[in-house]
């Protein structure tokens, strides 16, 4: 078994003494830093490598914290116009994950880089911490590598803002299998392809 396999098994047991201690120390450390900051290396190298990271020039890791909880509707003085059923402000749930938000914010912060993927690293009562893998499309090492130079094409600019990353596709309901059988896309297809002859019509 290689070293990465051991790291993977360690990361799985989040309630172990080692992981609990590490997460508490790291959460404190991350809170002292800026909201978005560059990490010198991934804190989960096994996970980063599985998602496409390589320890070579052109690849960058940024760490970000996102506040946990629901999303309050941004309306001036709480004034929502319309019917009472649509007047909710406080108890609304954002339909995309915190990881999506993290990718978007890092993508705006590093607008000259391309977001490849991201992963969860830590969380506490207030924040969730993510690490985002970015690629420099103008770097020669990236442009000459046939495994990653697809991301250089202009069509991949700000792919995180258009739901084209892994987590972005998940929240769009695009996929196959039991997780996606009740997704909006599947429901729309079913609605359009089901003949419904109601009694009173």
Swiss-Prot record:
PROSITE patterns: RIBOSOMAL_L15E (PS01194). GO terms for biological process: cytoplasmic translation. GO terms for molecular function: RNA binding; structural constituent of ribosome. This is Large ribosomal subunit protein eL15A. Transmembrane segments: none annotated. Its main location: cytoplasm. Keywords: Cytoplasm, Nucleus, Ribonucleoprotein, Ribosomal protein. InterPro entries: Rbsml_eL15_core_dom_sf, Ribosomal_eL15, Ribosomal_eL15_CS, Ribosomal_uL23/eL15/eS24_sf. It is found in: Cytoplasm; Nucleus; Nucleus, Nucleolus. Residues 169-179 have a biased composition (Basic residues). Residues 161-182 are annotated as: Disordered. It holds the Pfam family Ribosomal_L15e. It comes from Schizosaccharomyces pombe (strain 972 / ATCC 24843) (Fission yeast).
